[in-house]
Amino acid sequence: MESSSSLLHHSYLSYLNPKFGKRPLVSYPLMQSSRKCKQTRICSNKMYVPGFGEASPEAKAAKHLHDFFTYVAVRIVSAQLESYNPEAYMELREFLDTNSVSDGDKFCATLMRRSSRHMNLALRILEVRSAYCKNDFEWDNMKRLAFKNVDDSNTRLMREYVLETSHVETDSDK
């Protein structure tokens, strides 16, 4: 049968027995490791996501958003150039024909190294990307839309499955 002292934390035992507090904590490795484990489970109310290795899902989403902000910045700069600097607009269009924006940093680094004119375009894209991310992107709206899209998609898929498997007549079948 377990003694009551193994069920109590060492700080409580040192209050009850002054000699107990002088013992090294190393003599209770099982109690310490199980306590840490329980704390982790109790404190975390989020889902465990296995298999992402190098990055969390949030980090991967942030990377995709980062690349998307580059794409948006290129669109904004392109639209601005089209109206007031057609020559620079054509240079950017030609560069876009041969270089993908799927990796935003690689795109900007390549653009910077092309020529001094391209360097100015790249700096403008970096400036617009930062300003759009910090000032104009509607983060709350994105969160709301993401929740709505997931809920709507789940509902639609479940409805389709139920209709396929239940052989229920719908109004269109009559």
UniProtKB/Swiss-Prot annotation:
Compartment(s) of residence: Plastid, Chloroplast
Impact when changing residue 133 to A: No effect on rbcL binding
SUPFAM superfamilies referenced in this protein's UniProt entry, alphabetically: RbcX-like
GO molecular function: protein folding chaperone
UniProt xrefs under InterPro entries: Chaperonin_RbcX_sf (IPR038052), Chaperonin_RcbX (IPR003435)
Residues annotated as transit peptide in the record: 1-45
Pfam families found in the cross-reference section: RbcX
Swiss-Prot/TrEMBL induction comment: Up-regulated by salt and desiccation.
Keyword Chaperone: yes
Record keywords, A-Z: Carbon dioxide fixation, Chaperone, Chloroplast, Photosynthesis, Plastid, Transit peptide
Subunit structure: Homodimer. Interacts with rbcL, atpB and THI1.
Biological function: Chaperone involved in RuBisCO assembly process.
Protein name stated in the entry: Chaperonin-like RBCX protein 1, chloroplastic
Organism: Arabidopsis thaliana
Lineage start: Eukaryota, Viridiplantae, Streptophyta, Embryophyta, Tracheophyta
Gene of this entry: RBCX1
